């Protein structure tokens, strides 16, 4: 996402404002997904979008607010929008911004923080934390049978995988659930084909990530159908002597 390098600054902004954070798929990990105010990948869930519809102000940092981020075409936004983007053409793209701030996400948020003081009361903070807990409770209660199966595997995977692991995911059911039900500690640890939702990218992306960062664990999450698109690239991985755990979700694809 456009705020991937602004994690420290955005985290400070969240603490200053005491606001709920709903990340897009590409924004997963910009703030640690375990932060009590974060709903990771929440834009794909109706429960989080319902909360967005009730907000009087939306601060959108480095996001295109694209259709592929929410699955419904348009966010149900009724409040004002303050939008931060490095591309001035995006400030009013799809949604009219009440305030547009053109600039790099990291530097712009840093300037916002300089103007803010942490004036959030403990009572306000608890109220916001409880709102996040309730949204997550609703999400969990509304999981489909398939999503519950995914959750079991993802929970185990999160426990055993090192925190620094990069997960290269394909367009498959397992990773769709992982978008909102798999916590990532920092940006660029969850690679997903958000733009065109293309099949077959997980393995090639993982090979590239492992070659760029040979000491960092990299794992592949892919469906059986998507894996067939780029299975020959296993030869490339072998030629480079890469260690790449591949988790294939078999669902008749």
Regions inferred by a protein language model and the residue ranges of each:
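Phosphate/pyrophosphate-binding active-site segments
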Residues: 77-171
């Amino acid at each position: 996402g456009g705020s991937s390098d602004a994690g420290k600054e955005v985290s400070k902004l969240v603490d200053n404002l005491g606001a709920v954070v709903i990340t897009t798929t590409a924004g997963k990990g910009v703030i640690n997904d375990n932060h009590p105010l974060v709903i990771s990948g929440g834009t794909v869930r109706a429960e989080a979008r319902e909360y967005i519809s009730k907000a009087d102000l939306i601060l959108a940092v480095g996001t295109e607010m694209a259709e592929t981020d929410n699955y419904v075409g348009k966010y149900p936004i009724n409040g004002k929008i303050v939008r931060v983007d490095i591309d001035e053409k995006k400030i009013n793209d799809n949604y009219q911004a009440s305030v547009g701030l053109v600039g790099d996400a990291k530097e712009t948020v840093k300037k916002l923080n300089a103007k803010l003081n942490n004036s959030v009361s403990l009572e306000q903070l608890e109220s916001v934390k409880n709102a996040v807990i309730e949204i997550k409770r609703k999400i969990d209660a509304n999981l489909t049978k398939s999503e519950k199966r995914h959750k079991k595997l993802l929970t185990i995977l999160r426990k055993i995988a090192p925190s620094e692991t990069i997960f290269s995911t394909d367009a498959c059911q397992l990773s769709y659930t992982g978008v909102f039900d798999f916590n990532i500690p920092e940006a660029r640890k969850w690679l997903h084909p958000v733009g065109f939702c293309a099949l077959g990218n997980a393995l090639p992306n993982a090979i590239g990530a492992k070659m760029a960062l040979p000491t960092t664990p990299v794992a592949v999450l892919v469906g059986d159908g998507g894996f067939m698109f780029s299975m020959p690239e296993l030869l490339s991985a072998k030629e480079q002597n890469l260690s790449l755990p591949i988790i294939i979700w078999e669902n008749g694809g």
